Amino acid sequence: MDNLEKLKNWIAESRNIVFFGGAGVSTESGIPDFRSVDGLYSQKFDYPPETIISHSFYERRPEYFFRFYREKMLPLGFEPNITHKVLAKWEEEGKLSAVVTQNIDGLHQKAGSKRVYELHGSVLRNYCTRCGKFHSAEFVKESVSVPKCDCGGIVKPDVVLYEESLDQDIIENAVSAISRADLLIVAGTSLTVYPAAGLINYYRGNRLVLINRDETPYDGYANLVFHESLGKIFANL
């Protein structure tokens, strides 16, 4: 039996799938991956992207931060791909219990997924740092320079920047889901960014599946490994 057939059988038998995904899930919708060869980290800016999207840079140079953010990190107008759609279908069928994602684009919800734990936040949520009022991603996209609320406060995206902590409630929910899963599918992530990558250590089962174009540090621990595009695999599931 080849690996794809084995994965199909595991999915058929499973009642508690958890999907843990990274940037590679959304690249097939056209959203660039930070760390791929042609991703953000290899492009040329006055500062390294990890400096620009840090909390201290946001505080120190908000105009530059928002210029970069609007241009490079605000993925509007993109649509869910086959992976997002299949996951939403599994949830509807009662097979998938949660999606844990490192992405900030909201495409899982756009595809219909309900239980999504966004480790790094979402560009779709933006709050005034003074009064707490909610603002849309379009508001931030269309604002000139630093987006300001009616009250005069800066509108900050609900995205976890470098030097900021992950939301503890989301971490706890993700850990709980992963530890109870009967099948854990990890896809489109290099598994090198912590603490997010460490979450798969909470999996207790023996059906750990890794799908990623490149090798990851966890390949040796997985029960099934695919070095393929996600779309190619999910189109056959």
Named regions from a protein language model:
Residues 1-237:
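Conserved catalytic core of sirtuin-type NAD+-dependent deacylases
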